[in-house]
């Protein structure tokens, strides 16, 4: 059996819709305040997709700059993975919509549903498919239009979420670089603390479900907070060990941008200096599967990661799911 190659990120991209919804705007919609939102979440603004935009549209707009950075065309992509909790349709997959809109004539396509951990899962899956020699260039995208899945009369959730997409192209890299280790976990017994109750065959959408608000995101905030901090901290330490490095070696740490208090709690647990982590939840809100990809593209384009840096991505989301990817940057 031939030795596996190394695989990593060749290019990144992101897209955020033009419309921005501020905390001041939300003050006019629900019983809340800018101070209350900022002190509890760190969020100041979030982007909202137009009614004409679909999740696959956001995916395409994030994918194009990623392809350009990688020096590739749609014809070079032989597999597409879209991580989303807000697909265009239940069937067909959003990834198939992206394949068509981008013109990736030779690509297979699939969606993965891992909540806010979706981008972490996609990086791990795509990298290992390339390592195994099954594909040469895989386009991964985390994308969400959560503004259509929140109850805009529920101040506990509508203040949190935003829309956007983050993309990356995964391919072969120099030995010793790219994905060094990953860890993916789940606990379905806690799925009920973060879900959309009426959204499938177990509980179909009915008039009663609509009237009772069960078609919208439901979240038990305190329980989600505790689980997020616990699992993201643990999965990060586990993956660092598997990669053969320590937390002191981390050059850039990007956690799922759910809530600034969660991010700071994880950073404190790992004793990370502020200049080794990145936070943009203040500008985007929680974009679920898109958040890590958006943040990664911003740090790459700002020149905050360089050749040889150790980059750590970690996430937590509905499922419950969690995961971590440790990479050495090309």
Where in the sequence are the language-model features?
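Condensing-enzyme catalytic core mediating Claisen C-C bond formation in acyl metabolism
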Residues: 1-51, 154-226, 230, 234, ...
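Short glycine-rich phosphate-binding loop at a beta-alpha junction
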Residues: 75-83, 248-256
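Short acidic, glycine/serine/threonine-rich loops at helix termini
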Residues: 20-21, 91-93, 150-154, 322-326
């Amino acid at each position: 059996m031939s030795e596996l190659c190394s695989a990593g990120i060749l290019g990144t991209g992101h897209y955020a819709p033009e419309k921005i919804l501020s905390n001041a705007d939300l003050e006019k919609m629900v019983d809340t305040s800018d101070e209350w939102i900022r002190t509890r979440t760190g969020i100041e603004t979030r982007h909202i997709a137009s009614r004409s935009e679909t999740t696959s549209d956001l995916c395409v707009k994030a994918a194009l700059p990623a392809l350009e950075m990688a020096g590739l065309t749609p014809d070079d992509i032989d597999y597409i993975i879209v991580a989303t909790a807000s697909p265009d349709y239940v069937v067909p997959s959003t990834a198939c919509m992206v394949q068509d809109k981008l013109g990736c004539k030779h690509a297979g396509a699939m969606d993965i549903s891992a909540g806010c951990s979706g981008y972490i899962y996609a990086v791990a899956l795509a990298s290992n498919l390339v390592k195994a020699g099954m594909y040469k260039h895989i386009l991964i995208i985390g994308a969400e239009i959560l503004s259509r899945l929140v109850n805009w009369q529920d101040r506990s959730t509508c203040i949190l979420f935003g829309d956007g997409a983050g993309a990356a192209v995964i391919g072969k890299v120099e030995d010793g670089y790219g994905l060094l280790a990953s860890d993916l976990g789940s606990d379905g017994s806690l799925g009920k603390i973060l879900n959309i109750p009426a959204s499938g065959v177990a509980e179909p959408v009915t008039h009663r479900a609509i009237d009772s608000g069960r078609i919208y995101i439901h979240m038990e905030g305190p329980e989600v907070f505790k689980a997020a901090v616990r699992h993201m901290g643990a999965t990060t330490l586990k993956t660092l060990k598997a990669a053969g490095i320590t937390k002191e070696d981390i050059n850039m740490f990007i956690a799922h941008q759910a809530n600034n208090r969660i991010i700071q709690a994880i950073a404190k647990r790992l004793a990370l200096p502020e200049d080794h982590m990145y936070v943009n939840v203040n500008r985007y809100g929680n974009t679920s599967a898109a958040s890590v990809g958006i943040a990664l593209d911003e740090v790459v384009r700002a020149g905050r990661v360089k050749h040889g840096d150790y980059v750590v991505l970690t996430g937590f989301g509905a499922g419950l799911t969690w995961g971590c990817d440790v990479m050495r940057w090309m």
